[in-house]
Amino acid sequence: MAQTQLPHDAKAGPTKPEVRAVVRSKLALTDDDHFVEVGSCTGAVTIAAARDAGRVTALERKADRLETTRKNLAANGLADAVELRNAEAPAELPADADALFIGGSRNYDAVLDHAAETGVDRIVMNVSRLEVAGAATQAFRDRDILTEVVQFQVSHGYELAGATSFDSENPVYMLVGSASGDTEADR
């Protein structure tokens, strides 16, 4: 698996590599899929998806972050592999997405409405704030699209006084859903 290079940064920072690995697993992208990311920021998830999906669209409302995505795509040899849109979702969301990643919590209700209306098969939303995780979980339930909630925390070891200690990242709440009518048992 190719390493993702992120030489260009954005204030929000990238989705961590371990979290991206779980996102990729939950999305289970194939070369037949149209993947859409809302809130591309550094492009870390977009880059991973561009290696798996046949078609990729990334939306980012902030022009400077979209430029960061563009630069990081180029640094990974994927400059022409992704359609970039400077828009605030749900505006300009494609109606033919097979898989959707929501990287931020802004307007997620409207994004989930769009996903439910268009029958997106695989939906993943990452949340780092507890209150948003609870509200977003309820939003998935209200639309009858919730299939799974995962909470995890990554810690990296470092040397401390000749032994190993751990530096912990913030926990991530991952909401997984489907608006296609398929259940997990059907997949």
UniProtKB/Swiss-Prot annotation:
Q: HAMAP family given for it?
A: CbiT
This entry's Gene Ontology molecular function terms read: cobalt-precorrin-6B C5-methyltransferase activity; protein methyltransferase activity
Q: Which residues hold S-adenosyl-L-methionine?
A: T15, G39, S40, C41, T42, G43, E60, A89
Q: Which domain of life is it from?
A: Archaea
Q: What is this protein called?
A: Probable cobalt-precorrin-6B C(15)-methyltransferase (decarboxylating)
Q: In which pathway does it act?
A: Cofactor biosynthesis; adenosylcobalamin biosynthesis; cob(II)yrinate a,c-diamide from sirohydrochlorin (anaerobic route): step 8/10
**Entry EC no(s):** 2.1.1.196
